[in-house]
Amino acid sequence: MPRYKLTIEYDGTPFCGWQLQETLPSVQGALEAAVQATCGVPTRVHGSGRTDAGVHATGQVAHCDIAKDFRPDKLRDALNAHLRPNPVAVLEAEIVSDTFEARFSARKRHYRYRIVNRRSNLALEVGRVWRVPQRLDSDAMHAAAQRLIGRHDFTTFRDTECQAKSPEKTLDQLDVVRDGDAVTILTSARSYLHSQVRSMVGSLVWVGQGRWSADDLAAALAARNRAACGVVAPPEGLYLVKVDY
């Protein structure tokens, strides 16, 4: 039974998140329905991580074992045909070793958070970005972000319902770049706590607005207390863009 690695993009807006839910639409559920329609038997699809409701992906990775040999391009096309009209697309399918695990084989996960920093309303990107009307000091945000790089106890920046055994994570990258009215936060790490990226982004926005200094951000991290976190950024600006193996 061959194992296939799938690279997937999706608009998270209509979904309750990646994880299968019995009564709610999920990305995992849409993919498993497409696989069953393609191969004729129920098949579990395992993702590299569970994105929250409203979070998007341009490079999510999953694997599944299919009881039928498909040429990878034929499987990709068949899955895409059965995925319609869901806003989910399989970009690539490839046969991999049966030891490959989308979640546990991952070495690094890359996320992008998109902010549009302008007073005018959004006309074209509603549900795709976070509009912040107050002018943000992106240089101050970037400088403060470097205080979070490295291995830390990120309790302040994790959801109270996070089920991770340890609050310690190693953050490899957290950059803030501006291009016109677009402010983008780029982050990479092997793994994250629940809501960690959105919590860090929201706190950095407070820095950009002048509500916090870099020292305030560092103090929030050191507090190891969820109550010390700034605002949590909304899900619509967050994208899982790549997973390294």
UniProtKB/Swiss-Prot annotation:
Any GO MF annotation of the entry: tRNA pseudouridine(38-40) synthase activity
Positions of the catalytic residues: 52 (nucleophile)
InterPro entries reported in the protein's UniProt record: PsdUridine_synth_cat_dom_sf, PsdUridine_synth_TruA, PsdUridine_synth_TruA_a/b_dom, PsdUridine_synth_TruA_C, TruA/RsuA/RluB/E/F_N
Presence of keyword tRNA processing: yes
Entry annotated with the keyword tRNA processing: yes
BP-aspect Gene Ontology terms: tRNA pseudouridine synthesis
Enzyme Commission number: 5.4.99.12
Gene3D superfamilies per record: Pseudouridine synthase I, catalytic domain, C-terminal subdomain, Pseudouridine synthase I, catalytic domain, N-terminal subdomain
Keywords: Isomerase, tRNA processing
Complex formation: Homodimer.
Entry similarity comment: Belongs to the tRNA pseudouridine synthase TruA family.
PANTHER family recorded: PSEUDOURIDYLATE SYNTHASE, TRNA PSEUDOURIDINE SYNTHASE-LIKE 1
NCBIfam families registered for this protein in UniProt: hisT_truA
Role according to the record: Formation of pseudouridine at positions 38, 39 and 40 in the anticodon stem and loop of transfer RNAs.
Protein name: tRNA pseudouridine synthase A
Origin organism lineage: Bacteria, Pseudomonadati, Pseudomonadota, Alphaproteobacteria, Hyphomicrobiales
